[in-house]
């Protein structure tokens, strides 16, 4: 059966949709119509492809991680090097696509939310390129954790708005950005950073990020005499790098799909972001998806060492994949992610983002299970420059405590 989601109402099975106030409906309908037109227009794709090639530096390599493979002693591990993109992560794929769409719609102002700051930097970069005014909403906690990325955004000409509501992290930044969009829909486009939000956002983000999986599929075929990998794997917060890798393989039933979510200090604590392990369906930021909530339906605070993964929900298409068993989602602790951060740095000379380190940690388990005659493609979603200072402090603290 050929996969054909979302349906015309923006649902992936029971997940997704448009759970938004009437005031936002006009903007969302306008966006949907503009996106359908752009999607059918070859000149839009030509302009985006040229930017991805000449400005972003695509295609990114598919790198056989021999030393990591030998160390684990299981499946051959290929890293899809999204860390080598301009701005250092996969986020630029989507930001450029959406800012190009905004230009086509005649919008001259851009707003976005950001957690780790990577989507904020990517959006500020695209806005600078197209000479658009840019405001980035970022939780106060994340502003502290990611001071370097805040400076980068400001250097690129963006205004960074520190959000002091709620738990002052990513979900609060999304709330603030949506509120700002409602009052400025005539001249402003909201660049959603992950495969979340009301339809058509999850589909738009998926389509712009699918360049990851399309390239990886083609590259793997080149090194394997036209074969498919046995598995593809990525970390998952909202889920955009994962959906970008997964989607081009969704009809290839022989290819297993694995997502690594963040279990923070452990599933037996309340300090985690393991939505599939501990969440249940609810509405958040305009879509029905699995979310972390208490017994009264209040959204709970997510926690992870990685600012890009501490979101209390997960994109509706991943929820659908989980429900129908097309993908398998497992959780990785802060400790496991830190070990993998160090491991990849030492074995391959590649310092991964803490988000991507969760994927590397799950890869160690999956590669062993698959065995030596199999192959796995792992999305290395971003580089670790932004995390080095945080990890240094963490390791210093652990040394002091004698861990």
UniProtKB/Swiss-Prot annotation:
Protein name: Tryptophan synthase beta chain
Alphabetical list of CDD domains matching this protein: Trp-synth_B
Protein's pathway: Amino-acid biosynthesis; L-tryptophan biosynthesis; L-tryptophan from chorismate: step 5/5
Cofactor: pyridoxal 5'-phosphate
Listed GO MF terms: tryptophan synthase activity
Residues recorded with modification N6-(pyridoxal phosphate)lysine: 91
Enzyme Commission no: 4.2.1.20
Keyword list, A-Z: Amino-acid biosynthesis, Aromatic amino acid biosynthesis, Lyase, Pyridoxal phosphate, Tryptophan biosynthesis
Entry function: The beta subunit is responsible for the synthesis of L-tryptophan from indole and L-serine.
Reactions catalysed: (1S,2R)-1-C-(indol-3-yl)glycerol 3-phosphate + L-serine = D-glyceraldehyde 3-phosphate + L-tryptophan + H2O
Alphabetical list of InterPro entries matching this protein: Trp_synth_b_CS, Trp_synth_beta, Trp_synth_beta/beta-like, TrpB-like_PALP, TrpB-like_PALP_sf
Protein family per UniProt: Belongs to the TrpB family.
Subunit: Tetramer of two alpha and two beta chains.
Gene Ontology cellular component terms for the protein in this record: cytoplasm
């Amino acid at each position: 059966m050929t996969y054909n989601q979302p349906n015309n109402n923006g649902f992936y099975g029971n997940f997704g949709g448009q759970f938004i106030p009437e005031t936002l409906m006009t903007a969302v309908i306008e966006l949907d119509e503009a996106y359908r037109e752009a999607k059918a227009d070859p000149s839009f794709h030509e302009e985006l492809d040229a930017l991805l090639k000449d400005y972003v530096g695509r295609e990114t390599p598919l790198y056989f991680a021999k030393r990591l493979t030998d160390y684990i002693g299981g499946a051959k591990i290929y890293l899809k090097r999204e860390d080598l993109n301009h701005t250092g992560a996969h986020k630029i794929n989507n930001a450029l696509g959406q800012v190009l769409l905004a230009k086509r719609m005649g919008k001259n102002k851009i707003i976005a939310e950001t957690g780790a700051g990577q989507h904020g930097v990517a959006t500020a970069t695209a806005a600078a390129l197209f000479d658009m005014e840019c405001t980035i909403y970022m939780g106060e906690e994340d502003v502290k954790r990611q001071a370097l990325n805040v400076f980068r955004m400001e250097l690129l000409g963006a205004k960074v708005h520190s959000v002091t509501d709620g738990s002052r992290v990513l979900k609060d930044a999304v709330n603030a950005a949506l509120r700002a969009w409602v009052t400025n829909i005539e001249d402003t486009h909201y660049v959603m950073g992950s495969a979340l939000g009301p339809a058509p956002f999850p589909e738009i983000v998926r389509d712009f990020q699918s360049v990851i999986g399309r390239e990886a599929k083609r590259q793997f075929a080149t090194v394997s005499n036209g074969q498919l990998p046995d598995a593809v794997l990525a970390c998952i917060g909202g889920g955009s790098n994962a959906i970008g890798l997964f989607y081009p393989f969704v009809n290839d039933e022989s290819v297993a799909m694995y997502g690594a979510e963040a279990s923070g200090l452990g599933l037996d604590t309340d300090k985690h972001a393991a939505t599939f392990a501990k969440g249940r369906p609810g509405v958040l930021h305009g879509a029905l998806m699995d979310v972390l909530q208490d017994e009264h339906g209040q959204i709970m605070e997510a926690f992870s060492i990685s600012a890009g993964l501490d979101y209390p929900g997960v994109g509706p298409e991943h929820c659908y994949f989980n429900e129908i068993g097309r993908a398998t989602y497992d959780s990785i602790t802060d400790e496991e992610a830190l070990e993998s951060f160090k491991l990849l740095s030492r074995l391959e000379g590649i310092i991964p983002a803490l988000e991507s380190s969760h994927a590397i940690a799950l890869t160690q388990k999956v590669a062993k299970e698959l065995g030596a005659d199999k192959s796995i493609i792992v999305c290395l979603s971003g580089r670790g420059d932004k995390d080095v200072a945080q990890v240094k402090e963490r390791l210093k603290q652990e040394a002091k405590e004698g861990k």
